[in-house]
Amino acid sequence: MGKAQSKRSIDITTDPKKVGEGDEVAGKVEKIDVDQKTDAPAVNGDAATPKEGGDEAAAVEKKETEEHSENDKDLTTEKSAAVAEGGDAVAETAKGEEGSPKEAAAGEDITPLADESIKSKSKKDKVKKKWSFRSISFGKKDKQKPAKSEEATSPTSGTTSPTTAEAEAAPAGDAAVAEPSVATNGEAEKPAETATATSEPASKDEKPAENGSATEQEKQANGETEKAAPAPSTVEEAAKPKPAEEPATVTATESNTTATEEVPVKESQPEPEVVTNGHGAGEALTNGSSNGLAESPVTETAPVADNIPSNVDDEPPHQNGTNGTTTPPPTPVATEIEKGQQIEASSEVIETVTPSQAEEEVVAAIIKAVSSEPEAETETETEAEGFVLVAPVSTEVEVPVSISPIEPVAEVSQVKIEPLVEIPEVEAKSVADVSEADTESVPKVSELKTEVSEIEFESVIVETRSSSPPPPLPKSPPPSRVSAFVLSEDVIEEQVTPNVPEVNDVKPDEIEQQAISIVAEITEQAAEIVTEQEKQQEEAKVDSVPETIEESSSTVVVEEVLPVQNDEVTAPSPTPDDVQKPIEDQDTPDEKESYPVPDPIDPAAVNDEVAVTEAVDCEVEKETGSISSNVAESSSVSDEQAAIENQVEILEEQTVAVEETTEQETSDQQVISEEAHSDNDKENEIDLVENIISDLDAPITKAGGDLLVELDARSAEQEGESNNKVDLAKDLKEKNAAAADVTTQEQLPVTCE
């Protein structure tokens, strides 16, 4: 049979270039075997040790390495029989020259081609056609590798992946041998079909060759015989389903089956390769039997195959179960755990998942125990704090990490989170109460409950505030804490701020009261009505206004009552100067006592307003002095006109500085200036006072925007009226300069300080 195959190989590889490619690929297969020798022990050391005893795995690996070099030649011959195509036949003849002289004739034709291929490697790199064949082969290799690497990502395939990855090296090289030959067969589709047809009898024919090689190897090592014996069954099984596949795929899959013969020596799991090709688990059982029991002789292989299905049966449920249930969630979960929580614990969990199925079993047991723990935790959590966990999956994510390292951190976070939940209740209380509540809330719950409740807070807070899915839960808790603190600070600021607007409200009230007192001093009957209004206002403001304001308002009432006495004395007769002087003396100390009281309050609010009020006080005192001097020298009508004109000038100055006082005083000016020309002054003044009071009440309650609008309208009217009266006021002032100067000079240094 070998002669027929050699003839077929000669017929296919008549072109020297193609034969050279086959030789190169065959040589590369040997190099890949060397790579497998180096790589296999490391992979097997990681994957096989947890399943098998460390000593057994080491012994098997040593035997595999020793046997592999010996099996390289036999495997190449077996591959040529299994693939039954030119590239493998060339490799077979190349080594057949060394081992068997039967194919010397074919070898003579091929050896010079092999030499040429070795020499022409640099030339082939430059040639495009040859690269096209290689690109096809390498492209298929790349396609095969990523699929298995993806399987390697899952922990179950991680154990099998090393075998597949290494097997790919050799089978890929074999595929490279077979695929260029397929390209040559592509010239005529019939030889490809014949290859498929022959591959089946070739697999049957391999049995004597493999058995012969096995008998030779039994002398050297028993493990090799085991490989050779089960291998033909795998080849037969592989050959049966393959005819349905395409001819090109037949070569690749058969090369993979032969590769399983190579790999089983190194790794106990070449099975997935055959399984990935779509073959049943029976092949895997035979391969696993030969690999798992490398020490047993060939005769025991059949019963061993019966025993090994139990091992394989133990493994596949892990593959199905872990891939189906446990492994896919932990991988995304593990990545999230690395981000949101401690990376060390998560990396350990990931390592336990990936290296081997035995570790996966441990992980599954841990996950089960952990899953039972979060259930108990959830019960304790709901009992302790009444929170409802929206996603129990988040607890599973947190559990593996929540072992020892996170517990202290959780205790710290709990101290923060629990008071935050309690803050809305404590907002009415002082900050000291909050600290007490913090200290009290921690000892109430036991340490175990605190740890559990911490996880609850993190999960619950994240779920309530961020409606995102459970995976990002570990990320959000720290920002949720920060936001909670910010909210608590905002609440505290809100508690503080309502006091500030009260102070602001109080200060304009004080200014309004001062303005009311000034107007009351100027007008005769404003004092009594204004006092009644202020009493009503004070009663309304007792809650919000501090006591100092009440004192200032009371002193203002005294001021307002005294000017009423002044006006009452001056109105009937201009004679009582002696009465006015002590009254004025009383006014000044009253003003001294009254105005300094609001001064400490004013600087807290607005210094400008304080300065304006002081200037107003000085001017009011000037007005009172001028009124007294005018009463002594002129009639009451002229006194009122002078006072009104003085007010016009003063109010014009005040309008620039203070808008609220100007509104009140300008309303007084308009009414007073209009009625100053009338003969019946006091009768009109009674009406004026009532109008003034009504005007005062309105602007006090009006908003700033309305006040500004009224100021603009009133100031325009005042300017026209005041300009006409300024001249008369100047004349009256010149006549009364002496008395007015004396009184104002005495009062200014006292009051304006």
UniProtKB/Swiss-Prot annotation:
Changing residue 137 to A: Partial loss of phosphorylation by PKC. Overexpression in perineurial glia, results in reduced locomotor sensitization when first exposed to ethanol and ethanol tolerance following repeated exposure. Induction: By ethanol. Changing residue 135 to D: Overexpression in perineurial glia, leads to decreased ethanol sensitivity upon initial exposure and has no effect on ethanol tolerance following repeated exposure in contrast to overexpression of the wild-type form, possibly by delocalizing the protein from the membrane. It comes from the Eukaryota. One of its GO terms (biological process) is behavioral response to ethanol. It is a lipid-anchor. Residues 119-148 are annotated as: F-actin binding. Residues 1-345, 462-482, 531-604, 620-641, 658-684 are annotated as: Disordered. Disulfide bonds: none annotated. Coiled coil: none annotated. The keyword Phosphoprotein applies. The modification Phosphoserine is found at residues 132, 135, 137. Myristoylated; myristoylation promotes accumulation at the cell periphery. Residues 81-93, 152-181, 246-262, 545-561, 626-638 have a biased composition (Low complexity). Residues 468-480 have a biased composition (Pro residues). GO terms for molecular function: actin filament binding; Notch binding; protein kinase A regulatory subunit binding. A lipid is attached at residue 2 (N-myristoyl glycine). Residues 8-38, 59-77, 139-151, 216-227, 532-544, 578-594, 674-684 have a biased composition (Basic and acidic residues). Detected in the brain in both neurons and glia (including perineurial glia); specifically in the neuronal nuclei in the cortex and synaptic neuropil (at protein level). Detected in germline cells, somatic follicle cells and outer rim of the ring canals during oogenesis (at protein level). Isoform A: Detected in the adult (at protein level). Isoform B: Detected in the adult with higher levels in the head (at protein level). Residues 120-132 have a biased composition (Basic residues). Homodimer. Interacts with Cam; interaction is calcium-dependent and is inhibited by PKC-mediated phosphorylation of Akap200. Interacts with N/Notch; the interaction stabilizes N/Notch protein levels by preventing Cbl-mediated ubiquitination and subsequent lysosomal degradation of N/Notch. Interacts with Pka-R2. Binds to F-actin; interaction is independent of myristoylation, but is inhibited by Akap200 phosphorylation and Cam binding. Isoform B: Does not bind to Pka-R2. Scaffolding protein involved in the regulation of PKA signaling and anchoring to the actin cytoskeleton integrating signals propagated by cAMP, diacylglycerol and calcium. Contributes to the maintenance and regulation of cytoskeletal structures in germline via PKA-mediated signaling. As part of ethanol response in the glia, mediates ethanol-induced structural remodeling of actin cytoskeleton and perineurial membrane topology by anchoring PKA to the membrane of perineurial glia. This is A-kinase anchor protein 200. It comes from Drosophila melanogaster. The gene is Akap200.
